[in-house]
């Protein structure tokens, strides 16, 4: 879960979400990413959800831009311009090349190893080493999502949103508020 900033409208749903995950018998750790202060905010909200069947791992952002690879996703956090410390996020999902069954058959790769090879895993079995490059074509275009919220226009948004398949940009003000904001 990536937090942009710690205003109530962006964090107050966390306790309910944590409790729902716990009730759904989640046991694997949950990673939270957010600006500096994340641990303090999460601990305060955990008063409502103190007992969970999974660990919470917090990553506090300290740089103007940081990139992580988690669970196969490449996540880039970048600062935007709000009245509190605030980040936007770009999430990219890389995609392997297409599986070539003909190549797998030509190389006598047993069917039971096709699935892990298709997922990009190397298989060592029966004295043989099977690698994804033996059966996968060139990498395919991945999926890129960019999310930003509660910010004034800044160059970093344009740079990160470039070539996104989905760009979500929540604005604070509508056209009717333009003149009032200019006056501020």
Segments from the language model and where they lie:
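Active-site metal-binding motif and surrounding structural segment of the metallo-beta-lactamase
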Residues: 1-33, 57-62
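Generic structural signal for residues in well-ordered beta-strands
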Residues: 55-58, 75
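Glycine-rich, phosphate-binding/catalytic loops in enzymes
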Residues: 17-20, 49-51, 163-165, 184
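A gly/proline- and charged-residue-enriched helix-loop-helix capping module
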Residues: 37-47, 58-63
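Metal-dependent phosphodiesterase/nuclease catalytic metal-binding core
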Residues: 62-184
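Short, charge-rich binding segments
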Residues: 22-25, 50, 80
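Hydrophobic packing residues within well-ordered alpha-helices of enzyme cores
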Residues: 14-17, 42-45, 157
